[in-house]
């Protein structure tokens, strides 16, 4: 079992950022999302990218992301949408974003389910 690590927004912002402009099924038009690549965040916290990561939300929804997908598609943990911090009522404060416009093959339920919003925890899953 990995020890629990709590990161504040300031710590996330100190890591290299990535932005994606993408369409999502839950919003009316393309938006620009700014955040930290999960690969960068996981390497920063754990020293490497684990085989699987469980991402949980404020409403107790959970989804599992694989290392293969994290490395290949480089999803981000977004904290800004269109240059504004994401509020809880708008799916914040953190939202896992895959660049669907860049990878149209991801635009289906399997990957939609992995784009957890209102993220409040990440746990390494042991196989």
Show where each model-derived region lies.
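N-terminal intrinsically disordered, low-complexity segments enriched in P/E/S/T
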Residues: 1-127
């Amino acid at each position: 079992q990995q020890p629990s690590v709590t990161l504040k927004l300031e710590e996330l912002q100190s890591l290299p950022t990535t932005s994606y402009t993408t369409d999502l099924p839950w919003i009316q038009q393309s938006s620009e999302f700014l955040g930290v690549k999960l690969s960068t965040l996981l390497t920063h916290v754990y020293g490497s990218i684990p085989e699987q990561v469980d991402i949980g939300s404020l409403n107790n929804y959970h989804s599992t992301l694989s290392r293969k997908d994290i490395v290949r598609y480089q999803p981000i943990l977004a904290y800004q949408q269109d240059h504004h911090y994401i509020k809880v009522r708008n799916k914040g404060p953190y939202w896992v974003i895959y660049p669907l416009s860049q990878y149209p093959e991801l635009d289906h339920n399997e990957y939609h389910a992995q784009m957890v919003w209102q993220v409040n925890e990440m746990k390494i899953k042991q196989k």
